[in-house]
């Protein structure tokens, strides 16, 4: 089984997600105690997809995250670079236009999408700044980006408990339910190494996004960042 290192070599990350694809959604539901469904609902609200809009759902995995946008009447493109994830997504949701693509070199023309979103995927990209610039490039003027990512709890006592869960409790639980438990050791390590909420906001601004803001979910376990492409 593959476990990616924190230098996030693309072939390692893709292989790791290929390994967990079959049980990915179930494992996430169990490890997050069902909170992942709450977080994804908040993403859908922030994207605010409308009929006939074009939405890019990057790092869509099995495309479960794309369903709310499709139900809203938008044309959603689930995009991922794990072929294993895409195969599962195509089997489960054959009507969606699943697309293989790298976040640092997106296979779309400039100014294509009304909104772009990435949930729990930006942390796995080797070059975060290039990915943010690529998302900006493919977004129409006036469009928005919504990023949902694991982050850093703001209340110190809770942050301590959460860190203990990541490093001590999560790995054995993952061993019981995941087809590749080492992937969840990487998950814990990559969360600890991820930028803080203000740091990620600043990187969004440097990529060109305006009106950047964020709000914390579940006490900062997850942060929802949003920005706009100026008209």
UniProtKB/Swiss-Prot annotation:
One Gene Ontology term of the molecular function aspect: demethylmenaquinone methyltransferase activity
Gene3D superfamilies, per the entry: Vaccinia Virus protein VP39
Family to which this protein belongs: Belongs to the class I-like SAM-binding methyltransferase superfamily. MenG/UbiE family.
CDD domains: AdoMet_MTases
Pathway in which this enzyme or protein is active: Quinol/quinone metabolism; menaquinone biosynthesis; menaquinol from 1,4-dihydroxy-2-naphthoate: step 2/2
PROSITE patterns: SAM_MT_UBIE, UBIE_1, UBIE_2
Role played: Methyltransferase required for the conversion of demethylmenaquinol (DMKH2) to menaquinol (MKH2).
Organism: Streptomyces avermitilis (strain ATCC 31267 / DSM 46492 / JCM 5070 / NBRC 14893 / NCIMB 12804 / NRRL 8165 / MA-4680)
Residues involved in S-adenosyl-L-methionine binding: 62, 80, 102-103, 119
Keywords: Menaquinone biosynthesis, Methyltransferase, S-adenosyl-L-methionine, Transferase
Name this protein carries in UniProt: Demethylmenaquinone methyltransferase
Catalysed reactions, semicolon-separated: a 2-demethylmenaquinol + S-adenosyl-L-methionine = a menaquinol + S-adenosyl-L-homocysteine + H(+)
Record-level GO BP terms: menaquinone biosynthetic process; methylation
EC number: 2.1.1.163
Main EC class the enzyme belongs to: transferase
Domain of life: Bacteria
């Amino acid at each position: 089984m593959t476990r990616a290192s924190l230098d996030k070599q693309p072939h390692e990350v893709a292989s790791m997600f290929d390994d967990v694809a079959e049980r990915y959604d179930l494992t996430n539901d169990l490890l997050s105690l069902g909170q992942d469904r709450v977080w994804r609902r908040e993403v859908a609200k922030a994207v605010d997809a409308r009929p006939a809009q074009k939405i890019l759902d990057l790092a869509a995995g099995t495309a479960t995250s794309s369903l709310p946008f499709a139900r809203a009447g938008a044309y959603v493109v689930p995009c991922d670079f794990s072929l294993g994830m895409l195969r599962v997504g195509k089997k489960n949701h054959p009507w969606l236009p699943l697309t293989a693509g790298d976040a640092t070199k997106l296979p779309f023309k400039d100014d294509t999408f009304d909104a772009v979103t990435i949930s729990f995927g930006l942390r796995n990209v080797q070059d975060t700044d290039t990915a943010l610039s690529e998302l900006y490039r493919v977004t129409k003027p006036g469009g928005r980006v919504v990023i949902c990512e694991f982050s850093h709890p703001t209340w110190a006592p809770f942050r301590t408990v959460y860190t203990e869960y990541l490093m001590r409790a999560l790995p054995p639980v993952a061993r019981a339910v995941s087809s590749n438990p080492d992937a969840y050791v990487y998950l814990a390590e990559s969360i600890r190494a991820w930028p803080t909420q203000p740091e990620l906001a600043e990187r969004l601004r440097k990529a060109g996004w305006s009106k950047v803001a964020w709000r914390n979910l579940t006490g900062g376990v997850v942060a929802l960042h949003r920005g706009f492409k100026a008209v």
